[in-house]
Structures are given as structure tokens and as C-alpha cells.
Swiss-Prot record:
It catalyses: Endonucleolytic cleavage to 5'-phosphomonoester. GO terms for biological process: mRNA processing; regulation of gene expression; rRNA processing; tRNA processing. Digests double-stranded RNA. Involved in the processing of primary rRNA transcript to yield the immediate precursors to the large and small rRNAs (23S and 16S). Processes some mRNAs, and tRNAs when they are encoded in the rRNA operon. Processes pre-crRNA and tracrRNA of type II CRISPR loci if present in the organism. Its main location: cytoplasm. Keywords: Cytoplasm, Endonuclease, Hydrolase, Magnesium, Metal-binding, mRNA processing, Nuclease, RNA-binding, rRNA processing, rRNA-binding, tRNA processing. The active site is at residues 51, 123. Residues 160-229 form the DRBM domain. Residues 5-134 form the RNase III domain. Mg(2+) binds at residues 47, 120, 123. This is Ribonuclease 3.
């Protein structure tokens, strides 16, 4: 962790008060499983917290920066910024994958550069930073790493199929859209999910993805295309 701490200080001016918290953020579930450590020692709880912190900071930034955009447009932008591929790229740009503690099996399967793993790592780091130093530091970090891409309009044109589907269906009147994970397959380090999207109880489409978020987006995309099958 010393190399990571040095990198954080040099690149972002960050010095963690709680080194164990930082280590936990960079500990994958495959590592705790192989080492027979308590499940609470992996980064999943921190990921949960970081996801909320990230969404709040991005929402606040978009609201203040784009006063002319309506709620639907802001939601599309936020969704494109916090989607799996985007967060994985932010994690790569920070060089976080190098410091992730993985199980040997996960390492051999290419887990160090897996999109969902890097997404979760980025969110876990934000969660750890929030606990260690508060929301202001989380905001500063996001301003440094994420916001420059937003300013370049990198995410304005990215399609959020869930939002698009909702807008299409609302044209026809009253609608209640819901998503359900129908199936989970594969080992813990390489899961696949099948999601279905429903409108007023009627299934419209299914999608396959390496995360629940991706599977739901794919289901929405297939629903828009009128393809009621998994792809």
C-alpha cells in the first residue's frame, strides 16, 4: 500500500488517515475468499457508499452547470457518467487496477482489467475517501478526475436506454416500468446477469450483461427495438 499512498499524495494531494480503510477499498471479494477473511473485509460495502456519494456530486454539478437542461436531459447525462464503462475508464486513468488485491483465480481470469471490477473499485475508493476525509474531499477528487470529461461533452451524446424507454412509453400515457434480474450465472469472479424490463406487468425485453446495470440497459435497448429476447 505504500506505493499507492505515494501515488495518491503525488497525483491528488491525498493522505489517508486510516490506512486499513484504504486497503479495504482495494480488496476484492476473491481475495478475502481465498484468504478466508471475513466478507466485511472486502470493498463491497465501501462500493455501496461510494456509489451514492458519486451520484450526489455529479447531480449537484449538472444541476448547477446546465440550468437550461430539463430533468430528463440531466438524468441522461448523469447515467452516462456513472455507467460501468465510464467508471472503469476513470479507474484506469487513476491507475487503480495495479493496486487491487485479487485472488489468484480472479487474477488468472483477467479480473484486474474487468470493467465491473474497476467500476466497483472506483466507487469503493470514493466511499473510503468519504469516510476518511468527508464529502468536500470526495467532491475535489471528482472535480479533478471526472468533471474535465463532462466539460468536454464526452457524455452528452451517450445513449441511456432506460431513460429513453421511459420517455417513449410515457408518450402513450400512464406507465409503470420495472426491471427484474431473472438469472445469475457463472462463478463469483465472473458473473453474468439476465434482466427483463416490464411495463404495467408486461414483459417488453430481456438483456444480458456482466453487471446488473448493463443487463438492465440491454433489456431496455431490446425493448426499444422490439426484440423480446436475450442479447
Amino acid at each position: 500500500m505504500l506505493k499507492l499512498q505515494k501515488k495518491l499524495k503525488n497525483d491528488y494531494g491525498l493522505v489517508f488517515n486510516d490506512e486499513y480503510l484504504l486497503k479495504t477499498a482495494f480488496t476484492h471479494s476473491s481475495f478475502t475468499n481465498e484468504e478466508r477473511l471475513p466478507k466485511i473485509a472486502n470493498n463491497e460495502r465501501l462500493e455501496f457508499l461510494g456509489d451514492v456519494a458519486l451520484s450526489l456530486v455529479i447531480s449537484d454539478y449538472l444541476y448547477r452547470t446546465y440550468p437550461e437542461k430539463l430533468e430528463g436531459e440531466l438524468s441522461k447525462m448523469r447515467s452516462s457518467i456513472v455507467r460501468t464503462e465510464s467508471l472503469a475508464n476513470f479507474s484506469r486513468s487513476c491507475g487503480f487496477g495495479e493496486f487491487l488485491r485479487l485472488g489468484h483465480g480472479e487474477e488468472k481470469m483477467g479480473g484486474r482489467d474487468r470493467e465491473t471490477t474497476l467500476e466497483n473499485l472506483f466507487e469503493a475508493f470514493l466511499g473510503a475517501l468519504f469516510i476518511d476525509q468527508g464529502m468536500d474531499e470526495v467532491r475535489k477528487f471528482i472535480q479533478h478526475v471526472v468533471i474535465p470529461h463532462v466539460k468536454n461533452d464526452d457524455y452528452v451524446k451517450v445513449i441511456d436506454y432506460k431513460t429513453e424507454l421511459q420517455e417513449v412509453l410515457q408518450i402513450g400515457g400512464e406507465t409503470t416500468i420495472s426491471y427484474k434480474i431473472l438469472k445469475e450465472e457463472g462463478p463469483a469472479h465472473d458473473r453474468s446477469f439476465v434482466a427483463a424490463v416490464f411495463n404495467n406487468g408486461k414483459e417488453l425485453g430481456r438483456g444480458l450483461g456482466k453487471s446488473k446495470k448493463v443487463a438492465e440497459q440491454k433489456a431496455a435497448e431490446n425493448a426499444i427495438k422490439g426484440q423480446n429476447h436475450v442479447s
